[in-house]
Amino acid sequence: MIVAGHETTANIVHFALVELATNPAAQRRLQRDVDAILGGRAPEEWDYETTTNALQASMVGASVNETLRLMPPVVSIPKEVSPTQDQVLNISGEKHLLPRSTYIDVTVSAVQRNPRYWPTRPSRVDPSKESDIEDFVPERWFQTGGAGPANLQEAEVEGADTEDFGGFAGPDTSAQLYRPPRGAFIPFSDGARSCLGRRLAQVELLTALAVIFRSYSIELAVDDFVPGTDAGDEKVAAMDRKQLAGLYRKAQENSRAVMATASTRLTLKLHSKNHVPVRLVKRGEERFVSWVDEDA
């Protein structure tokens, strides 16, 4: 537990920042929720019971969950039937016998992208696709048409602390967010041997995003898409809205293409020279994310 999240949590924060830079409308909604929940309070004034639950039920929690859905740290989880007895699984009313010592590989990335278990709509990223199951859409986690609970301060995380040495027994999401069927959302595995540090990881993720987005915005760097190599900032400053939107669209397309190359070496991450350059800017000084995709 001392080093919990050193690799996995850091990767999820990284992926979440890139996704939010690639999807400015989601980032703006997240910042509105952060402002509503935290006001002007400094991090040292935040309270675990009220602040964490409110963040979990907001666009912050939805963004964390959506990142975990699309980019789970561990894409494949090994399981094994007890060596002492067979096990019977009841799936959709049918019983399936698993012989003792059977090795099972649970493919997290597949079940979490199965449209059978998730709210979907036609893709805004690729209009030719009937489903946005492959897209980063945090709003799918809200049960009321893309809006969070009316009072974020009174949000609950049902079962959040029902954790013992036998494994966390509660759900992975806020009581106010969409609840996929058991087994459809398993970034922390499931059952008696699920991740003991899941609640710690969730708090770390929520806090990291809240600290960043209360003061800053994340934008995709567009340097590689500005013609010429000199005076890039000056060229961008001289562009009109239509040109800026086209420039940022190129960065968005590149970001999605690079993110699709993520692969596993112990955990899921970008490797070799694959990376998505971003800019950290103070809120109010954005060039793109304050208005790009306003119709989303």
Enumerate the predicted regions with their spans.
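Cytochrome P450 I-helix active-site segment
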Residues: 22-74, 99-102, 132, 225-246, ...
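C-terminal helix/juxtamembrane-tail motif
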Residues: 271-296
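Central I-helix of cytochrome P450 enzymes
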Residues: 1-33, 67, 103-105, 205
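A structural signal for well-ordered alpha-helical segments within the folded catalytic domains
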Residues: 11, 15, 58-65, 179-186, ...
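Short, conserved secondary-structure segments in the cores of folded domains
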Residues: 2, 92-94, 184
